Amino acid sequence: GAVPAAQFSPRL
């Protein structure tokens, strides 16, 4: 996707 996952709250 064009939006990096870092923008959201990573739940790893």
UniProtKB/Swiss-Prot annotation:
Domain of life (superkingdom): Eukaryota
Keywords from the UniProt entry: Amidation, Neuropeptide, Secreted
GO cellular component: a single term: extracellular region
Matching PROSITE patterns: PYROKININ
Subcellular location: Secreted
Keyword Membrane (UniProt): no
GO BP, one annotated term: neuropeptide signaling pathway
Modified residues (Leucine amide): L12
Keyword set includes Transferase: no
Function: Mediates visceral muscle contractile activity (myotropic activity).
Family: Belongs to the pyrokinin family.
Protein name: Locustamyotropin-1
Organism: Locusta migratoria (Migratory locust)
